[in-house]
From Swiss-Prot:
GO function term, MF aspect, one: actin binding
GO terms for cellular component: brush border; cell cortex; glutamatergic synapse; growth cone; NMDA selective glutamate receptor complex; plasma membrane; postsynaptic density; ruffle membrane
Region (Disordered): 204-224, 295-320, 460-487, 608-685, 787-822
Name listed for the protein in its UniProt record: Epidermal growth factor receptor kinase substrate 8
Subunit structure: Homodimer. Part of a complex consisting of ABI1, EPS8 and SOS1. Interacts with BAIAP2. Interacts with SHB and LANCL1. Interacts with EGFR; mediates EPS8 phosphorylation. Interacts with MYO15A and WHRN.
Extent of Basic residues compositional bias: 299-309
SH3 domain mapped to chain residues: 531-590
Tissue specificity field: Expressed in neuronal cell body and neurites, and prominently enriched in the axonal growth cone.
Region (Helix bundle 2) residue spans: 752-757
Biased composition (Pro residues): 208-221, 623-649
Region of interest (Helix bundle 3), residue spans: 762-767
Function: Signaling adapter that controls various cellular protrusions by regulating actin cytoskeleton dynamics and architecture. Depending on its association with other signal transducers, can regulate different processes. Together with SOS1 and ABI1, forms a trimeric complex that participates in transduction of signals from Ras to Rac by activating the Rac-specific guanine nucleotide exchange factor (GEF) activity. Acts as a direct regulator of actin dynamics by binding actin filaments and has both barbed-end actin filament capping and actin bundling activities depending on the context.
Region called Helix bundle 1, residue ranges: 718-738
Length: 822
């Protein structure tokens, strides 16, 4: 229900008092009831709408709105936080860095106060008496939050007021602001009451009752508990029994798959792994935010003397509540599924390798286990089981402390499917992602077949999940297995939730996640066949909207890395690569001199290892790969050491790496073994390719050195900023310097003077490119001083000369200039 003018529990809005005659339903005669049963949906809709509009005068002055609490700032001049606009500016910076965590709640307005109520427990979180509300303002369409309600409140015990910001979706902020302002006006004892008229206006603007449907409602589908779960489980079990172990059909398919089919399958697994890492990172940050709120709440309770709640403690209590157990279970399942995917992809990803990602995941896994009070909840997560390859891979990869954590999780994390009884049902795992993304179907497998299998697995998984919830609910009535979780109001909070023995620090897992911001697997394969380098010139400016896109300027010359789709992957002269739409590019026949880097910089992006997916024809050489990390020298490793990153099997896959000598030295043995397995003519062709590429690279390097690597200057106007520059000019300047979208959106809201006032540490705290921004600002300041220094000096000298001349004329002494002219 999208309204607020209803006395139904499904919506939020003005509800009637029990004292005004609407608390109980009036008596109806038998004829009236028969007439009502025959009333059409449209007539019923009109009756309800008229009732909602006409009964405003008879309802109590209590209105409720569902809002999202964005953040709370202390208005302090030291923090440059004085007005609502300052708060909106800081909100934009936090939003650009992904640090805004919304909290759903109910905002209630009556004739005495504005209250914040917990959506689930209905407990009052905050209470702001109307006389403590200093300012109320609606802010629309200033950032990604398009309807913001700003409340400035200061209680007598506070030294500085608080600024509370709410996002209002169901009822717009301007209507809620009008309601609050009218309540404040009436509380001051005005002769004419404003609030009834304001409520009537709100009801007219948003009656809150949806129109009747044009067609009768469809028959609802059967729920998970209503479907024939046993038949579906039997069907799934029969299919699994026919196929045997889950690894067997995969191996069978691998023998028949073409390189393109395997590439598509690996690409899908890579996408699933990326979304799993995203969801785990989000959950860890959510845990960290809850821990921070709990820590702040504990400090406040220790410092204050009375038991009365202080300002802001209610919202802190709500934010300190940990996620529900179901979210912990989902996170553990994604950890297990992620380990399975890493074992499958260990030969196909690099920089970092699958082994590095295993070490990377064990730190947040340890934090989640601690947050649940121990390994009990994690050990109860049965599906998905780890595969045999995964168990072998982890045994070879994990360190001593990681192995200790792994062993503590029990047999559900150690035993493969073959070690469980055949009659025991293991529900299939269907991952569900926070953003609603679903893995793409594999076309070569047959969409109907795979879709049927997916739906079957999902229905069985839903049934198993429903059964698990019922079992956990039944167990919770007998004895609380999760005693460390607080009650619904969130006030009883156990320190053991976040502190249980000598464990890892609160932010360590989050820092581990932040340490590799670009840890996503590269989903893009190079074409199978070797092609000469292609270049294109951009016809227009293009600003990247995410990390996978690349910002380009008009007339930029770009190297084309992948042009198989509508968005082409290109590399600019600085070595940065990303996707741009192909309709802004013009193909160039010959590359301009000096364009493109032969040694692109090191990147932290996980890339797919270029390996042969199947037998290849003799006349199909492999293409040079995009920049992977230097391959390690194959040295025998102990069992606890990470698995070495697989290297390309074909020597034609020589890539432009920063340490090409180490790669060539470390790959001689592999190359010789590879050559022994190939025909002589095939070996010669590959050697010729390597020699040709080496000759071309040497030739390019020599010619570039002779030309002194002259890069043609583009006819792009130079963009500078001054202290008087507007935020739009600052944003344009940042884009022209090639900063990423996060930096542009974070700093593009500042004017020139505000940007110049920030030091390096402040810039680093706002955006990851803070050091580079500071250096560019320093250059701009120096340019301003060079351009305006002489004129300012002349102005100062002119004023000084006027003063000397005036003093000389009063005393009868000639000025310096006059004296020197004689």
């Amino acid at each position: 229900m999208n309204g607020h003018m209803s006395n139904h529990s499904s919506g939020y809005g003005i509800y009637p008092s029990q004292m005004n005659g609407y608390g109980s339903s009036p008596p109806y005669s038998q004829m009236d009831r028969e007439h009502c049963s025959r009333t059409s949906a449209k007539a019923l809709y009109e009756q309800r709408k008229n009732y909602a509009r006409d009964s405003v005068s008879s309802v109590s002055d209590v209105s409720q709105y569902r809002v999202e609490h964005l953040t709370t700032f202390v208005l302090d001049r030291k923090d440059a936080m004085i007005t609502v606009d300052d708060g909106i500016r800081k909100l934009k910076l936090l939003d650009a860095k992904g640090k805004v965590w919304t909290q759903d709640m109910i905002l209630q307005v009556d004739d005495r106060a504005v209250s914040l109520i917990d959506l689930e427990s209905k407990n009052e979180l905050e209470n702001f008496p109307l006389n403590t509300i200093q300012h109320c303002q609606a802010v629309a369409h200033t950032c990604s939050y398009d309807s913001i309600l700003a409340l400035v409140c200061k209680e007598p015990t506070q030294n500085k007021p608080d600024l509370h910001l709410f996002q209002c979706d169901e009822v717009k902020a301007n209507l809620i602001s009008e309601d609050i302002e009218s309540a404040i006006s009436d509380s001051k004892g005005g002769k004419q009451k404003r609030r009834p008229e304001a409520l009537r206006m709100i009801a007219k603007a948003d009656p809150g009752i949806p129109p009747p449907p044009r067609a009768p409602a469809p028959v609802p589908p059967g729920t998970v508990t209503q479907v024939d779960v046993r038949s579906r489980v039997a069907a799934w079990s029969a299919w699994a029994a026919d196929q045997g172990d889950f690894e067997k059909p995969r191996q069978y398919h691998e023998q028949e798959e073409t390189p393109e089919m395997m590439a598509a399958r690996i690409d899908r697994d890579v996408q699933i792994l990326n979304h799993i890492l995203d969801d785990i990172e989000f959950f860890i940050t959510k845990l960290q935010k809850a821990a921070e709120a709990f820590s702040e709440l504990s400090k406040r309770k220790k410092s204050k003397k009375s038991k009365r709640k202080g300002p802001g403690e209610g919202v802190l209590t709500l934010r300190a509540k940990p996620p529900p157990p179901d979210e912990f279970v989902d996170c553990f399942q994604k950890f297990k599924h992620g380990f399975n995917l890493l074992a499958k992809l260990k030969s196909h990803i690099q920089n970092p390798s699958a082994s590095d990602l295993v070490h990377f995941l064990f730190t947040p896994l340890n934090m989640v286990v601690q947050a649940t009070g121990g390994p009990e909840l994690a050990s109860s997560v049965l599906s998905p089981l780890l595969t045999k390859d995964t168990v072998d891979f982890l045994n070879y990869t994990v360190k001593a402390e990681e192995r200790q954590l792994w062993m503590s999780l029990g047999e559900t994390w150690m035993k493969v499917r073959a070690e469980w009884p055949k009659e025991q049902f293991i529900p299939p795992y269907v991952p569900r992602f926070r953003n609603g993304w679903e893995p793409p179907m594999l076309n070569f497998m047959g969409a109907p077949t795979e879709q049927d299998m997916y739906q079957l697995a999902e229905s069985v998984a839903n049934a198993a999940e429903q059964q698990r919830k019922q079992d956990s609910k039944r167990q919770s009535t007998e004895h609380s297995s999760m005693s460390d979780y607080p009650p619904a109001d969130g006030y009883t909070f156990s320190n053991s939730m976040y502190h249980r023995g000598p464990h890892v620090d609160q932010g360590e897992a989050a820092l581990a996640l932040k340490s590799t911001p670009n840890r996503h697997v590269d989903r893009n394969y190079d074409p199978v066949k070797t092609q000469p380098k292609k270049y294109a010139k951009s016809k227009y400016d293009f600003v990247a909207r995410n990390s996978s896109e690349l910002s380009v300027m008009k007339d930029d010359v770009l190297e084309i890395l992948d042009d198989r789709k509508q968005w082409w992957k290109v590399r600019n002269a600085s070595g940065d690569s990303g996707f741009v739409p192909n309709n802004i590019l013009d193909i160039m026949r010959t590359p301009e001199s000096g364009v493109g880097r032969t040694d692109p910089p090191y990147t932290h992006t996980i890339q797919k290892q270029r390996t042969e997916y199947g037998p290849r024809s003799a006349d199909t050489p492999s293409a040079p790969s995009p920049p992977p990390t230097p391959a390690p020298v194959p040295v025998p490793l102990p069992p606890s050491a990470p698995a070495p990153v697989p290297v390309p099997k074909v020597p034609a896959n020589v890539t432009r790496q920063n340490s090409s000598s180490s790669e060539s030295g470390g790959s001689i043995a592999r190359d010789s073994q590879r050559y022994k397995q190939l025909p002589v003519d095939r070996r010669k062709s590959q050697m010729e390719e390597v020699q040709d590429e080496l000759f071309q690279r040497l030739t390019i390097g020599r010619s570039a050195a002779q030309r002194k690597f002259h890069v043609p200057r583009q006819n792009v106007p130079v963009i500078n900023i001054t202290y008087d520059s507007s935020p739009e000019e600052v944003k344009t300047w940042l884009q022209s310097k090639g900063f990423n979208p996060v930096t542009v959106s974070s700093l593009g809201v500042l004017n020139g003077a505000q940007l110049f006032s920030l030091n390096k540490d402040e810039l680093r705290s706002v955006c990851p490119e803070g050091a580079r921004v500071f250096s560019q600002i320093t250059v701009q300041k120096a340019a301003l001083e060079d351009s305006s220094g002489s004129s300012e000096l002349q102005e100062i000298m002119r004023r000084r000369q006027e003063k000397i001349s005036a003093a000389a004329s009063d005393s009868g002494v000639e000025s310096f200039d006059e004296g020197s002219s004689h």
